[in-house]
Amino acid sequence: TSKVKIGRLITVAYLALCKNSRKTCPADKSDSIRWCPIDDLPRLPFDHKEIIEAAIQEIRNWVEKEPAIIFDYMPMKFTAFQLRRTYEVIYNREMDVRNFHKKMNSLDYVVPTDDMQDGVAHRAARYYRFDKVKYNQQRSKFNKI
């Protein structure tokens, strides 16, 4: 095998959030382009792993600065499990179910609906929705302090 010698290399990385239902475009013309779970990335060249780690930290910073960003990537109605799993993926750690429910229920802008899951083998979960008006009211109260 011969190694390619590279004098200098500049990597430009772009960061964007998109829903996980998004598919790669067939026009990409490459079989190697695919979505990968963050905890199961393929071996990456150069400093690309560090770039991805920095991007993940940046997403965490976005969520801490503006928590509503999470709800842009949730279905219109979602379960507590779906919301908790989203946070677990972002922060790469399991969260205590009871503590998460307490925290979630303390947020005025996460509103329970009358809808319940159907067609599931386990106890049906309640659906919630994000109330942007309540969120903005709460944020404006906080900003006045």
Over which residues does each language-model region extend?
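NUDIX/MutT-family hydrolases
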Residues: L9-L17, T24-N61, M74-F81, N99-D108, ...
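Short acidic, glycine/Ser/Thr-rich loop/turn "cap" segments at secondary-structure junctions
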Residues: T1, W35-D40, P67-I69
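Active-site-adjacent beta-strand/loop module that shapes the phosphate/pyrophosphate-binding cleft
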Residues: T1-R22, I56-Q57, R126-K134
